[in-house]
């Protein structure tokens, strides 16, 4: 059981591809991190995996079925997507925002039931926002809004969870909380794909990494292999140093000259 992008290419402008023949697969029960410089195609790849974007070439398979042959509601039952910068048009409460994650499981004219509310509150508790459930979403800090959106994705209870920079705009404690929650969800059987600009998030929490450069796959594999100093320099254009403990890499830092 997996979510597979097979040789996909995508262009916003005809023939100017931001993704070129990228193949990547995430299985249920693992975390895959997407890394690369700004403009390397991370978010576009994530959007192709969830059906927001349709690649001009290649295909996306959801547990062996073609993703784009499913209705939007059916896709949402299997793939939850947490974008980076959605803005709430209305001052919904935090609990109402998270409850939207239950929409694929409620009929078009139905109302959320007790089961849906329980799952929304469970998701809020997981990210530590249960004490803010009645607050308008517009009154939260940037980091708290990120946590609320991640809770909405968790409440959706899809077998695949896709997150665009879940560790962005968070203090170290909340970064650890969110990444630990994601890691535990993977242990429970979810397939997780997350973009990040922090190689250490992938090193500490990821099972596999896809490193992109200019819309093409530069490296794929275990973090300790795909995040070498040489490959990171090729991806980002600056030198890196790998700090180890004699057993394996423990931290990745930009190398400061002088």
Give each language-model segment a name.
Residues 235-258:
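ABC ATPase nucleotide-binding domains
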Residues 1-5, 9-21, 69-71, 89:
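A short, flexible loop at the N-terminus of ABC-type nucleotide-binding domains that lies
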Residues 136-140, 144:
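Conserved ABC ATPase signature
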Residues 161-165:
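Catalytic Walker B motif of ABC-type/P-loop ATPase nucleotide-binding domains
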Residues 58-66, 75:
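Conserved ABC transporter NBD signature motif
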Residues 50:
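Helix-to-loop junction immediately C-terminal to a conserved catalytic motif
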Residues 35-37:
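The feature captures the beta-strand-to-loop junction immediately N-terminal to the Walker
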């Amino acid at each position: 059981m997996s979510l597979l992008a097979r040789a996909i290419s995508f262009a916003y402008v005809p023939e100017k591809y931001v993704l070129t023949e990228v193949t990547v697969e995430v299985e249920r029960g693992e975390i895959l991190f997407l890394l690369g410089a700004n403009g390397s195609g991370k978010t576009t790849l994530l959007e192709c995996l969830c059906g927001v974007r349709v690649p001009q070439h290649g295909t996306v398979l959801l547990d062996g079925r073609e993703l784009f042959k499913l209705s939007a509601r059916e896709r949402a039952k299997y793939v939850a997507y947490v974008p980076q910068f959605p803005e709430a048009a209305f001052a919904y409460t935090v609990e109402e925002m998270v409850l939207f994650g239950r929409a694929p499981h409620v009929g078009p004219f139905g109302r959320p039931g007790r089961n849906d509310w329980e799952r929304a509150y469970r998701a809020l508790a997981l990210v530590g926002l249960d004490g803010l459930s009645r607050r308008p979403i517009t009154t939260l800090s940037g980091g708290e809004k990120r946590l609320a959106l991640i809770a909405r994705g968790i409440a959706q209870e899809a077998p695949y969870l896709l997150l665009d920079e879940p560790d962005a705009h968070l203090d170290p404690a909340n970064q650890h909380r969110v990444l630990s929650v994601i890691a535990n969800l993977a242990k429970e059987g979810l397939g997780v794909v997350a973009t990040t600009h922090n190689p250490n998030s992938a090193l500490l929490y990821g099972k596999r990494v896809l490193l992109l450069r200019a819309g093409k796959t530069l490296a794929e594999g275990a973090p300790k292999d795909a995040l070498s100093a040489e490959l990171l320099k090729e991806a980002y254009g600056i030198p890196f140093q790998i700090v180890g403990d004699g057993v394996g890499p423990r931290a990745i830092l930009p190398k400061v000259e002088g």
